[in-house]
Amino acid sequence: LDSWKSKAKNYLKYDSTGKDVIRFGLLAAAHDTIPDDMNKGLIKIGRDGCSKYMSVDKWLSSDLKTIEHIAPQTNKNSMWDESLYDTHIESFQSLGNLTLLPQDLNSSAGNSDWRKKLLYYQCVAEKDPSKISDIENRATALGVTLNPTTIELLKESNFSEHLSSISLMSANDFWNRDLVDRRTETMLDIIWDRVSKWLFE
């Protein structure tokens, strides 16, 4: 595990490997996992069947079509933790800073700041339709401006379980390199747990 994980940290990155490999890794990490209530923003292995992501339907789903950088690839106006963009490590390209979104929401989120992106993730991970319909008031409370097109996109988005761990964070929490690195470690452990069973059993 240690040898594999060391290599995966360096090579299982958005700019270092094929996008299909990254998507597979994100789906494997989301499969049967739940938010870690002791570590905000992280996930842990849940019960069998609690979050089914390793399926052809999920692979082909338009809701999981594109890879989203949570802290964007370009740190405009230094809105994000600068250490994520260290040129020697580039944590912003690692699995812990990536998730899956539909193409339209990914494009809309773009280079937005943490508060706005969090609102997107909270909408997609929301199970209560009444909270989705109240998106404008939620945005106003966070000091976030949403145009009518974005509001409609969010209202029409389908529920996605894999964003639950991020959606439980608050606008006052920090999306920084420490969290991203810990997310990457956790996700790689889970991926190894899944894949090693196929390789060695």
Whereabouts are the PLM-identified features?
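Long, cytosolic, alpha-helical-rich C-terminal regions that act as interaction/scaffolding modules
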Residues: 91-94, 98-99, 103-201
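Intrinsically disordered, low-complexity N-proximal targeting/linker segments that flank membranes
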Residues: 1-80, 84-91, 95, 100, ...
